[in-house]
Amino acid sequence: METLAATAHPDRFADRHLGPREAEIEAMLEAVGYASLDALSDAAVPEAIQLRRPLDLPDALSEAELLATLRGLSEENVEARSFIGMGYHGTVLPPVIQRNVLENPGWYTQYTPYQAEIAQGRLEALLNFQTVVSDLCGLPIANASLLDEGTAAAEAMSLFSGAHRGKRSRFVVDARCHPQTVAVVRMRAEPLGIAVDVTEAREATLGDDLIGVLVQYPTTDGEIVDYADLADRVHAVKGYVAAATDLLALTLIEAPGTWGADVALGSSQRFGVPMGYGGPHAAFFATTEKFARKIPGRIIGLSQDRHGAPALRMALQTREQHIRREKATSNICTAQVLLANIAGFYAVYHGPDGLTAIAEYVHGLTARLAAGLRAAGHAVAHDAFFDTLRVAPAGESGEGLVARAQEQHDINLRLYANGDVGVALDETVTDADLADLLDVFGGDLSEAEAEPGAGAMARTTDFLTHPTFSAYRSETEMLRYLKRLENKDLSLAHAMIPLGSCTMKLNATAEMMPVTFPGFAGLHPFAPLSQAEGYEEVLGSLEEWLGEITGFDAVSLQPNSGAMGEYTGLLTIRAYHAAQGDDRDVCLIPTSAHGTNPASAVMAGMTVVAVKVDDDGNVDLADLKARAEEHAPRLAALMITYPSTHGVFETTIQEMADVVHDAGGLVYMDGANLNAQVGLCRPGDFGMDVCHLNLHKTFAIPHGGGGPGMGPIGVVEKLAPFLPGHPVVPTGGEEAIGPVAAAPYGSALISLISWAYIAMMGPDGLKRASQIAILNANYMAKRLDGHYDVLYRGPSGLSAHEFILDVRPFQKAGVSAEDIAKRLIDYGFHAPTMSWPVAGTLMIEPTESEGKAELDRFCDAMIAIRTEIQEIELGQADAEDNVLNNAPHTLAEVSADDWTHAYPRSQAGFPTPEAAAHKVWPSVGRVDNAYGDRNLVCSCPPMEAYA
């Protein structure tokens, strides 16, 4: 019988992901002067580094095949009941939040809210989150989230060290902090020369070398400890106290700020966010007024717009890495906005009474469990607890009991090194679960009666008294509140977001769906590996695929942001040099680099030396050679972005690598611009030694309004032994550095999105995506050239996947880059990246997901704005009262009874037919950032502000 060839389904995902249709591709190629996509990419990418073979990846799956495959893999994971605790808990995500936030592109596709006028919805949501954290922690200032609890603790240590100007060297960590937190803090401390003393903090010797103390409250084994005396002793020697804590517990126990903590931090995961095998979850960080201008991460604050109305925006940005660079307080860039929003909405949904009721429910179950365990003859270590018990089993080893619980009941418990067993309860636990737990210990539910209570540490202060947390008790009201906030924000559901260096591509629905599969979402990160076989297959194959795409020999998925990828990559370089017996600590960084580069280098214990950039935007090769020669004995690394931050494939990239290698250093490549490389060239082939990959850029994880992100690193073979390890789950190389994230695989849950993207695009689709990204950028540059000056192009006259418009000449007419950015809002667009990497410019990156019609719509808007600028230049428009200076215009302003401007309402609010038909109106006028920084308000304002 004749064998039939396999038939591919005609509906290919790549055709859905890529914006332009074939006829549009041909038209754009003709406009830029190339006959084919291959001819275009051959001209853009230096010949010496081009990949001359297809990527060795599996053939593309259809969306249906992808979903079936991942559902099958999710079912290979065992959905056991995990009572392990250690900062990860079962939780109930309210369906109204799951459907309308987590699964809603109106919430997950935006970028960080740099354009506040079209981001008031998520800014309010983040202010809610900050208010929750501030109220529960009893501290006046909270940020808009950090990456995870471990890194938040490390940030607290760095904050305290900075307060002492680096003159103190000892940081005490209480031995009953979560082990992963201890390990992350130790890793952060070592390059900074800080000695970490892990001990019983209340018995530690405190002297004038003390930076501060970190405690867990309640402790990792569940005890509620009164740390007031410790705080007094620490403050007496001018040290500081950080408390890693639990938001749900804080509804019942005294706020850390009340007993003297200077910082309270932790994970908000149990406020509705699935465990997801470790992340992503929003960490929180609250502190005193003293540290308001040094706190790491983003802060949302209240200001006013040009009409004097209340308006929200990101506050105190001048302290951040993109401005302060190596002097920044932190390298934190992306945070966990989507997860912070979910946690904040969870608090809004339940309100203070509902949260307290949940906490009392959990604590009541725990008290009953403790009574039942004691009745069965077991020793429960502590009398004061919230949700976690430490048990010394009677008549059986802890190891045997834990194994039996897994085998007979699919129950996961924590095993301590001394044989004790840990049990942590949560809001998902039922009486049936309690009965099963007691059965494991040989107890009986009928004997599990006790009177719960927080004892001496019972909370005495109110929280969440703002009306927002009591106004939306019905689902109808909650739904409408979520929708009202969503409608204030521009997302990819409305228009392209052409932010340069941000790669705002499609986040396809099929890629997102597996995130909520129970077999993936419900897994505890410290569950036995035998229960995570589906995850192990996904994570293992993703590492292999990323290695093939980049040309590297090994990959670590642990870093949970691009900035942490930078930090991790530099730590592996540092560890390699140390293993060779070399004392190398100089990191060369071009002056055009993103601010996270120098900030990460300093965190990794390196000294930053700047390298000049020439007039064409390329690294000055002569200056690189001079700096490499000057610092050769101490040269650790060069950090380079490729294509460059100016959007150019530099032809000398291999020569740069040779210069550094010849001087004994290694080359770190910032992978922010990898979207122009996939399938066309591979960093590992042209001399790069380590590179981080922004999975939230190139590989389709959504930006979430400012997180989550994921920044895995790829390394050459000699660096593989130093990939980061973990104290609980074996990961990393033979000589692994310490962990850089709390969970062994970082934000494992969202790695599914990148796995799905690669699996559905296949090798041909991935290459075509890079080619169309380059085509779209060059087509737009061609259309705008002549209206604006396009800075920096390669030898062939082409940009890579992004390009820079010079708008500095318009300053003579009183028009700034900000004016153009705000005027674009009136046309229905989010602005490009503003004043980076060159002040007074706009950097545009369209990505491969936008079709020609949208590119033309944006170009038409930019050309129309150029005409408006010309009217000012020619005196045809008022120098002060003009559409640019007053942009953006709100619907309330345009429809008001009074109109006093020198231009018509139609020009203000309806500059094009498309803008008249559909756009996101700004809900506030231009925000006064300076006013907000002078008058810092970072929690929910009075209700009048929402009017």
Model regions: which residues?
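Non-catalytic terminal extensions of PLP-dependent enzymes
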Residues: 2-31, 43-83, 92-108, 114-117, ...
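N-terminal export/assembly segments and adjacent metallocofactor-ligating motifs
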Residues: 112-122, 128-130, 143-147
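Conserved PLP-enzyme active-site core in the AAT-like
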Residues: 121, 151-311, 373, 377, ...
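A conserved hydrophobic secondary-structure block that centers on an alpha-helix together
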Residues: 132-150, 167, 171
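General small-molecule cofactor/ligand-binding pocket signal
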Residues: 142, 195-199, 381, 414, ...
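Core active-site phosphate/anionic-ligand binding loop and the adjoining beta-turn-alpha structural block
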Residues: 270-271, 280-350, 638, 696-769, ...
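Conserved phosphate/anionic-ligand binding catalytic regions in large, soluble enzymes, centered on
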Residues: 273-286, 290-291, 335-339, 424, ...
